[in-house]
Amino acid sequence: MISNEAFVLGCSAIGAGLAMIAGIGPGIGQGIAAGHGAAAVGRNPGARGNIMSTMLLGQAVAETTGLYGFAVAIILLFANPLLGKL
């Protein structure tokens, strides 16, 4: 029979892995945004400053979901609040 602590740790590891899946979306989105930004600068080099600042702001906003997933994974693995409930 598995102990309660082992079960919580196992489920926390699975949850941390699932939380890290949140990093896939921002990575793909940022790659697409960078590609389109480079294409836009190639078409209109005079608007480089506006294009780059807008692209970087959009990438920063998109990255927050990945960072939240990373924070949840770190909390589940190293500062597990569920272990205190046993």
From Swiss-Prot:
GO terms for molecular function: lipid binding; proton-transporting ATP synthase activity, rotational mechanism. Disulfide bonds: none annotated. Keywords: ATP synthesis, Cell membrane, CF(0), Hydrogen ion transport, Ion transport, Lipid-binding, Membrane, Transmembrane, Transmembrane helix, Transport. The record marks 63 as: Reversibly protonated during proton transport. The keyword Membrane applies. The keyword Ion transport applies. SUPFAM superfamilies: F1F0 ATP synthase subunit C (SSF81333). Pfam families: ATP-synt_C (PF00137). Signal peptide: none annotated. InterPro entries: ATP_synth_csu_bac/chlpt, ATP_synth_F0_csu, ATP_synth_F0_csu_DDCD_BS, ATPase_proteolipid_c-like_dom, F/V-ATP_Csub_sf. GO terms for cellular component: plasma membrane; proton-transporting ATP synthase complex; proton-transporting two-sector ATPase complex, proton-transporting domain. It is a multi-pass membrane protein. It comes from the Bacteria. F-type ATPases have 2 components, F(1) - the catalytic core - and F(0) - the membrane proton channel. F(1) has five subunits: alpha(3), beta(3), gamma(1), delta(1), epsilon(1). F(0) has three main subunits: a(1), b(2) and c(10-14). The alpha and beta chains form an alternating ring which encloses part of the gamma chain. F(1) is attached to F(0) by a central stalk formed by the gamma and epsilon chains, while a peripheral stalk is formed by the delta and b chains. This is ATP synthase subunit c.
